């Protein structure tokens, strides 16, 4: 029972870390990356679909993204989705493919992006703290119901705190790496 609570908590930490990595991948840096646009939602065939299901996305050079729709009739919808996103990119098309030049970031925009990164890291840390509280409450309930001993409760709390500390260090590292990537010219 103790291990069930700890394993469930550890699974939540992994999910939170992966969610942060996924979110930060979509934040623009000075370099072109398919991750910037692949999850943009495009109004297509009466529903919203991620761009990576509608087109082939490639990065032939460091400051250019090429989007080649499987159906050329989707070009206007894809351009609209890119323009409505907060990426600050201006698409151009030749009727078959969309070229997406990625201009260098201004110093001001870099600072805004760093703030976004820090804010997102903090949101995930709050989620981790809330989950830690819930896991410890679950352990206390097990102890109150006499399903685990007081010693097991303390061991479980220590293990949960160790996992939390390790996760927070990893989240800080992920955030610092993204900040460095954003600030690199």
UniProtKB/Swiss-Prot annotation:
InterPro entries: Ribosome_recyc_fac, Ribosome_recyc_fac_dom, RRF_sf
GO MF term list: ribosomal large subunit binding
Keywords: Cytoplasm, Protein biosynthesis
Keyword check for Protein biosynthesis: yes
GO-annotated biological processes: translational termination
Location within or outside the cell: Cytoplasm
Gene3D superfamilies xref list: 3.30.1360.40, Ribosome-recycling factor (1.10.132.20)
Function: Responsible for the release of ribosomes from messenger RNA at the termination of protein biosynthesis. May increase the efficiency of translation by recycling ribosomes from one round of translation to another.
HAMAP family, per the entry: RRF (MF_00040)
Similarity remark: Belongs to the RRF family.
UniProt-recorded name of the protein: Ribosome-recycling factor
Species name: Chloroflexus aggregans (strain MD-66 / DSM 9485)
């Amino acid at each position: 029972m103790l291990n069930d609570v700890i394993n469930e908590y550890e699974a939540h930490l992994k999910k939170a870390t992966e969610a942060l990595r996924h979110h930060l991948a979509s934040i623009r840096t000075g370099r072109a990356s398919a991750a910037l646009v692949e999850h943009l939602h495009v109004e297509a065939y009466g529903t919203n679909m991620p761009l990576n299901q509608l087109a082939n996305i490639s990065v032939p050079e460091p400051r250019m993204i090429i989007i080649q729709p499987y159906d050329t009739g989707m070009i206007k919808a894809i351009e609209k989705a890119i323009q409505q996103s907060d990426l600050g990119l201006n698409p151009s098309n030749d009727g078959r493919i969309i070229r997406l030049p990625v201009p260098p970031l201004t110093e001001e925009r870099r600072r805004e992006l760093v703030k976004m990164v820090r804010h997102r890291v903090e949101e995930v840390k709050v989620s981790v703290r809330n989950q830690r509280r819930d896991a410890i409450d679950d352990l206390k309930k097990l102890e109150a119901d006499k399903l685990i001993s007081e010693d097991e409760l303390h061991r479980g709390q220590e293990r949960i705190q160790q996992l939390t500390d390790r996760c927070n260090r990893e989240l800080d590292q992920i955030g610092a790496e993204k900040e460095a990537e954003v600030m690199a010219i």
